[in-house]
Each structure stands twice: as structure tokens, then as C-alpha cells.
């Protein structure tokens, strides 16, 4: 019993086992890095791209409303009629109190109701706001900007985009990296 215990201790203390375990640890660390870093960088690039695109789309709407001294359903609808469709899932325009004056959603429209999405609240406080999240196979991006008339906030424009296309590309990248990692792990072991 003592002899088998000392053989096990000698086995774990041998230089070959230490090198082997070190090799496995290095390969595991490289595979972990390979599976996380490119995905994080890609996700960050998608977030930045979405912010740039959506902020630009909202700026076009804000610019079309900027000449109005106050916002109401009629003049907002007239101004929005000339704004080109920007590929957004939803656009809301509110007055300075958060009352929705315009909503592109056809069913369940929020026109005539108050909305307090955090991005709209920030816009009504004078800030541009953007948020983006990735879950359940889709990017959900939201942005809002204040509408100003003579340096006075008269409302806000909010845009929402639900995007599964870029999410599918990111999931495809993740799948390819996992397959590549499995192949490398199989070749190494």
C-alpha cells in the first residue's frame, strides 16, 4: 500500500506529467481566448454600427421636426410623411411631456398615451440616448434624441430596431469557432 502510494506520488511529480498538464492548460487557455475574444470584438462592432446607423436615422427625423414651434399629432404626421422609411422597426415622436404623437406601429399604437422608456426620458432631459442588447437570437437597439425649437425641448424622437440578421451572423461565427476549437482540441489530444 505504501509502495503504490509512493509510485502515484512519483507519477504526479514526474516532469513528463507536469509538462503534459502545462501543455493542456495552455491549449485550454488558447481555445478559451479563441472562443471569446473574436465574439466580444464582433459584438462591440455591431453595437457601434447600430448606434451610428440608428442615430443617423433619428437625426433625419429630428431635423424634419426642428422647424415646428410645437408638436401635435397633425404637424408631426405631416412632417413624417416626407421622411423616408429608414428600416427601423418602430419610430415614436412625443411632445415635451412624453405624450406619444406619432407611432409607426399599426397594431397597438401608443398614440395618445404617455411613454416613459428610459431613452425617451433622457431625450426629454436634453440628452441623446442609445442602448443595444443581444438576447434570444436578436439585437434590440433603441435610440432617442430631443427635438429642439429655439433651444427649448419640445419633444423627443425614439427609434427601435429588432435585428435577427446580424444576430444570425454572430451566432454563425460562434458556431464556426466552436467547431474549429473542437477540431484543434481533437488534433492536440
Region locations from a protein language model:
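Short hydrophobic/aromatic beta-strand element in the GNAT-like acyltransferase core
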Residues: 90, 130, 140, 144
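Short glycine-/small-residue motifs
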Residues: 103, 156
